[in-house]
Amino acid sequence: MTQLLVTTTENIPGHPYEVIGEVFGLTTQSKNLVRNIGAGLKGLVGGEIKDYTKMLEESRDVAVNRLRDNASAMGADAVVMMRFDTGSISQDMQSVAAYGTAVRFITEDLTTDNA
């Protein structure tokens, strides 16, 4: 996993950049039988379904790590404007997408041309 900068903002103070392109990190998780039974019972009485919350948190982490890896493979230094999207594929599957814009920092050339 690559630890490059991922931010939800458009600008990174002190770091001008050029856009490389869009980048994604995706994962799909399925709920197991035990979670489904527990969720069904919790649905009857109300309240947070902690197993589902944990599954979504883990899915989010996987999606962001894949986003970082994909951005790094593109030669990016950072990802700006990162967002999440989630959705149900079926009653038993949940997808999480992390997406944003891969960017490369612009470094100033400090050499002088005396020609």
Curated annotation (Swiss-Prot):
Task: Extract the InterPro entries matched here.
Answer: UPF0145_dom_sf, UPF0145_YbjQ-like
Q: Which HAMAP family does UniProt cross-reference here?
A: UPF0145 (MF_00338)
Q: Which family does it belong to?
A: Belongs to the UPF0145 family.
Q: What is this protein called?
A: UPF0145 protein lp_2083
Q: Which organism is it from?
A: Lactiplantibacillus plantarum (strain ATCC BAA-793 / NCIMB 8826 / WCFS1)
